Amino acid sequence: MAQPSIGQRIVVDVPSTTANLGPGFDCLGAALDLNNRFAMRRIEGDSGRFELIIEGNEGSHLRGGPNNLIYRAAQRVWKAAGLEPVGLEAKVRLAVPPARGLGSSASAIVAGLVGANALVGEPLSKEKLLELAIDIEGHPDNVVPSLLGGLCLTAKAASQRWRVVRCVWINSVKAVVAIPSIRLSTSEARRAMPKDIPISDAVENLGALTLLLQGLRTGNGDLITDGMHDRLHEPYRWPLIKGGLDVRDAALNAGAWGCAISGAGPSVLALCPEDKGQAVSQAMVKAWEAEGVASRAPLLSIQSGGSHWQPQIEDE
């Protein structure tokens, strides 16, 4: 597409993501068909100027300014392309609020990268944007599927290059994500984890991850059940989520194959066949309701296209 002119607005759609899926700590993530939308345009004036407009109640506490994550990501694009920074405005509509374990920071980073790149004629390749996204976020599990879509396994090779494997997630496996009104910061969730783990726990996770990936590829519910277990992070994070274990148990009792903390939490991910989706959703919401926590639990598919941009239609 042609480079948008100053003042012309573009729309960047970025999927929410669920990371870890139990045993895939910091390396496995999937894009969900629950998109965040960022309408962006270059503005005249101070090159460090960033204006943020939030539509709706989700993310109403977020602020603009040069330290905003969207603008920091945008600056990395311009620096990598050898360009001077420009002023930027972003009008944001979030599908879910931040600090819920659904990749809100990754979404902001990817929106900033994709949007800034588009606004200056796309000088950077998607591979370069991916490299910048991982560097800004510090771990790949959310930003990679947020940019590329689908189910992604990302690891740093011996060469120190990031390697991304696009894994198969068969369409018959659906995701129910219970999203509560409570918040949990990623930093708090990471502080709860020990610095060292027993080698037996690491071995168990490796086996579980293999089973989970095969279950997602084939739709084998038994493999998903056996694979969706974790020893590295979930034992230390479940106690941080009010009612979380009750929500997990309710999902399993309603027919889910497996259940995990979504990202750092507090949202809870359940995998199930489509015909069990409504029952699993209702059970999870009811379990949180018993703890005095409001929630919603949409039945979702995997979003395979990743992030993309287009010129904004005038009346959109």
Swiss-Prot record:
This is Homoserine kinase. One of its GO terms (biological process) is threonine biosynthetic process. It is an enzyme of class 2 (transferase). GO terms for molecular function: ATP binding; homoserine kinase activity. PANTHER family: HOMOSERINE KINASE, HOMOSERINE/4-DIPHOSPHOCYTIDYL-2-C-METHYL-D-ERYTHRITOL KINASE. Its EC number is 2.7.1.39. It is found in: Cytoplasm. Keywords: Amino-acid biosynthesis, ATP-binding, Cytoplasm, Kinase, Nucleotide-binding, Threonine biosynthesis, Transferase. ATP binds at residues 97-107. Pathway: Amino-acid biosynthesis; L-threonine biosynthesis; L-threonine from L-aspartate: step 4/5. The keyword Transferase applies. Its main location: cytoplasm. Belongs to the GHMP kinase family. Homoserine kinase subfamily. InterPro entries: GHMP_kinase_C_dom (IPR013750), GHMP_kinase_C_sf (IPR036554), GHMP_kinase_N_dom (IPR006204), GHMP_knse_ATP-bd_CS (IPR006203), Homoserine_kinase (IPR000870), Ribosomal_Su5_D2-typ_SF (IPR020568), Ribsml_uS5_D2-typ_fold_subgr (IPR014721). Catalyzes the ATP-dependent phosphorylation of L-homoserine to L-homoserine phosphate. Gene3D superfamilies: 3.30.230.10, GHMP kinase, C-terminal domain (3.30.70.890). Transmembrane segments: none annotated. One of its GO terms (cellular component) is cytoplasm. It catalyses: L-homoserine + ATP = O-phospho-L-homoserine + ADP + H(+).
